[in-house]
């Protein structure tokens, strides 16, 4: 009986020592990993990385949007987006006009200018970029020649839905994220 008690207590001590060793090794390994690189723009990051909420990341654009824009709702038909220097850009996507974000959009008619070589989408993006920090997104509806730009300045979280021939862009690392 004494042998059995001693064996159980020995096993228990060995198990505790093993758990302590595993914890020490795990904590040491965590300390050895380099800290995430701090950034303001994509150029601050390495190849294949993008600046998401102030740190360099290899997240896909869609995952980055979900991390950057808390409580965003994205229709399941929307499966991708692209990084641009200042925006997350979605094609065939529109804001849901029944939700708070979509209710307060402001239209801006864009017509081609012979002196300008910018596409209507570029003009729409520049309008939002040159505006105040209150621009929380832009949407373009039209073709390559002319269309309507909608500028959003509502800090509510966007609800995005599928919208054929719509382009919507949400600012990256924005104060209303």
From Swiss-Prot:
Induction: Expressed in the late phase of the viral replicative cycle. It is a single-pass membrane protein. The chain crosses the membrane at residues 8-28. It is found in: Virion membrane; Host cell membrane. Keywords: Host cell membrane, Host membrane, Late protein, Membrane, Transmembrane, Transmembrane helix, Virion. Residues 29-177 are virion surface. One of its GO terms (cellular component) is host cell plasma membrane. The keyword Chaperone does not apply. Residues 1-7 are intravirion. Belongs to the asfivirus inner membrane protein p22 family. This is Inner membrane protein p22. It comes from African swine fever virus (strain Badajoz 1971 Vero-adapted).
């Amino acid at each position: 009986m004494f042998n059995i008690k001693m064996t159980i207590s020995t096993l228990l001590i060995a198990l505790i020592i093993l758990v302590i060793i595993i914890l020490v090794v795990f904590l040491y390994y965590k300390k050895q990993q380099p800290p995430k690189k701090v950034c303001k723009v994509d150029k601050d990051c390495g190849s294949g990385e993008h600046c998401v909420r102030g740190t360099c990341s290899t997240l896909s654009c869609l995952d980055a949007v979900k991390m950057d824009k808390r409580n965003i709702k994205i229709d399941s038909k929307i499966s991708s987006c692209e990084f641009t220097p200042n925006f997350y850009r979605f094609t065939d996507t529109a804001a849901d006009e029944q939700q708070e974000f979509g209710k307060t959009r402001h239209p801006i008619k864009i017509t081609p200018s012979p002196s300008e070589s910018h596409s209507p989408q570029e003009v729409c993006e520049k309008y939002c970029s040159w505006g105040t920090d209150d621009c929380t997104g832009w949407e373009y509806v039209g073709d390559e020649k002319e269309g309507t730009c909608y500028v959003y300045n509502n800090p509510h979280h966007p609800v995005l839905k599928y919208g054929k021939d719509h382009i919507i862009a949400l600012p990256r690392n924005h104060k209303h994220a």
